[in-house]
Amino acid sequence: MSRNGGSDRYRAALADENAWARARRPKCCKLANSPWLRRAVAGKLRLDWSPEQIAGWLKRTHPEDECNQVSHETIYRSLFVQARGVLKKELLSHLRSKRSMRRSKPVDPNGDRRGHIKDIVSIRQRPAVVEDRAVPGHWEGDLLSGPNNSYIATLVERHTRYVMLAKVAGKDTQTVVCALIKQAKKLPNELYKSLTWDRGKELTDHRRFTLATKIDVYFCDPQSPWQRGSNENTNGLLRQYFPKGTDLAVHSQAYLNKVARQLNERPRETLQFETPAERFNACVASTG
């Protein structure tokens, strides 16, 4: 009122004119004023963090210091609005592109189009404690596929969103199950209690996996990828590193471990901007 009044009272016309004048006045970008903040944002972008993750991380690590916080909108504007020129345009390549909508796949009128797997245990029989993500140790898995019969097994822990990747030499059930057994033996028993998979025939020999690891396997309903939501989301993130058409066989297990580590060190909004690594390491420590 005081900014928009006349000599003795509020004037609507003058208020409107003054408001537009203030809106047109150029404002200095927060990133331009703070070299530390600019370096911090650029460094996290180079690690493929999203602007939302960066903003959430800054707010969590500097809760009382607004000078060391910046909104994700400011980061986006600094990247996309050429006039600002605050963040280098080369950092644009580190933003994740939007996933295109998947085309629907033809469904076998008899049900599962991927073949019959014996002795499956349906996801509908999965204990309720798995559903609410309150207890760690329950994983979702899938195969990421590339040309020339190249595959990566992707595993995501539901409670912490922790990711593990395994190089797989083929899609046959013996090869896949062996790779999954090897990964399972790297973890404490308390942190690997169940695995949820789709109806892919690569897990036809799921009984051997359970016998070797004491890990229960549950299968999703046909054509229901949303029943492995964490894993589907992770596969989308992985396409930033492995675009469709990439021969996955050229990547070493060491590189897959590096990619998994990068994903696990990104803060997640769903974890109150903690990282999967922080949550998972706390779970490991609690096992003694």
Region locations from a protein language model:
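Conserved short alpha-helical interface segments
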Residues: 2, 43-110
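Mobile-element integrase/transposase regions
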Residues: 28-32, 36-37, 96-153
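Mobile genetic element proteins and their domesticated derivatives, centered on retroelements
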Residues: 41, 54, 75, 142, ...
